[in-house]
Every structure is written in C-alpha cells, then in structure tokens.
C-alpha cells in the first residue's frame, strides 16, 4: 500500500547514487519517491567533499532537473518519514531550518537558520553551545569481557594440516554487499594464515556490551 521509496546513498563506505540515479533518469521514473541521502560520512570526506551539497553537484552534473534534485534532498525524504508537516519545505507552521547557498554551481552554504534563528554567517558560528555533560550511566560502556590481543585473531587449523580450504567474503568497492569466494590458505604452526597475494585478510567483530 505504501509503495517503495528509493534512497540513493553517497556516503564514505557506500556510494551508489550515480548508478541508481542513471537508472532513474534513463527510465524516466517518477522522482517523488526517490531521495538522495549520505548514510555515514567520515569527517575527512565532510571536510573535503561536503555533504548533500556534494551529492547535488554530482546529480546536476549528470543532467538531473534542478527542481527535482532539490526535492530529492528535502521534501521527498521528509515525506518518506512522515515529517513533511515539520520539515522539507518552507511554509507557515513548519520548522524554519534553512540553508542559503551560493547556487547550483557549488551549493556553498552562506547562511544557516535553525528554528528561524540564524546560527551561521559565511561559515562562522554565531551562537555558543555548551559542552554536553553526560550521566555516568552512559560513560565507559565499551567493556570487553576479554582483552583483545594478537592471539585473539588466530584461527586454529585441524591437527597436522598444511593448508585449509576457506570460505571468505569478497567485498565490493563502495558497496554494502559481499560475494562468496572459496580459497586455499596456508597453515603455519597450526594457525591459518592470511594471504595478501589472494587479498585475504582477517576481519573480526567484537561485541562491546557483554
């Protein structure tokens, strides 16, 4: 009943907006249910590339209509989360969160308003924010049951094995998907070794709350 809302990510780890946008444009799809988002962005990328301004430059460079591009980073996403009565557009009764930019050439932010209050001017912060103080219960929560050492990453092979067959994840550049890859890895002193020549490295997930 609700249909499907497409969110095209252009972040640091996942970058698929240009590929998806090309498909949308080539097939003349209705963009009302399409948004441009960033997902996670590293601080270095924020500093060097920008945020949604960078995505807008990319989209317009691909030939996307200007109005549709603006809608994709504002009202479309607000509608997807049923927040369009508060944000996503300029209208009486809505939150006056506004960025004034230089225009479609580079979208450099000149002035920012939050809740109708001007908080930046030409990149300078006009308001003062106190450093947040946190309750003790939310501090020092990353407690590992067992300390992590180099030995934590050792994978022991069956006794007497010189090589083992292993199932590994084949990661794709800037895509949140993996492919299956079957490899044969060497064993040294009973421990399965990484193999740089095959681009096989260890990866581990450590639960921090147990």
Regions found by a protein language model. Name each.
Residues 20-28:
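Short amphipathic alpha-helices and their capping/turn segments at secondary-structure boundaries
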Residues 44-63, 67-208:
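Active-site microenvironment of metallo-dependent hydrolases
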Residues 1-5:
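Hydrophobic, small-residue-rich alpha-helical packing segments that form membrane-like cores
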Residues 17:
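Active-site-adjacent beta->alpha loops and helix N-cap segments on the catalytic face
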Residues 7-14, 30-50:
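Short acidic/histidine-rich active-site segments
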């Amino acid at each position: 009943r609700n249909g499907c809302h497409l969110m095209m990510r252009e972040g640091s780890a996942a970058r698929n907006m240009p590929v998806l946008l090309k498909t949308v444009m080539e097939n003349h799809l209705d963009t009302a249910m399409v948004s441009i988002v960033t997902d996670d962005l590293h601080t270095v990328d924020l500093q060097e590339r920008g945020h949604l301004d960078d995505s807008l430059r990319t989209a317009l460079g691909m030939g996307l209509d200007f109005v549709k591009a603006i809608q994709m980073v504002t009202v479309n996403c607000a509608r997807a989360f049923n927040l369009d009565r508060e944000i996503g557009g300029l209208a009486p009764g809505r939150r006056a969160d506004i960025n004034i930019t230089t225009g479609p050439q580079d979208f450099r932010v000149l002035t920012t308003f939050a809740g109708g209050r001007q908080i930046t001017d030409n990149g300078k912060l006009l308001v003062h924010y106190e450093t947040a103080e946190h309750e003790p219960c939310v501090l020092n929560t990353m407690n590992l049951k067992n300390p992590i050492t180099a030995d934590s990453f050792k994978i022991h092979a069956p006794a007497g094995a010189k090589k083992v067959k292993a199932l590994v994840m084949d990661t794709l550049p800037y895509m949140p998907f993996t492919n299956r890859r079957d490899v044969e890895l060497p064993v040294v002193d009973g421990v399965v070794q990484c193999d740089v020549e095959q681009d096989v490295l260890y990866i581990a997930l450590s639960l921090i709350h147990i």
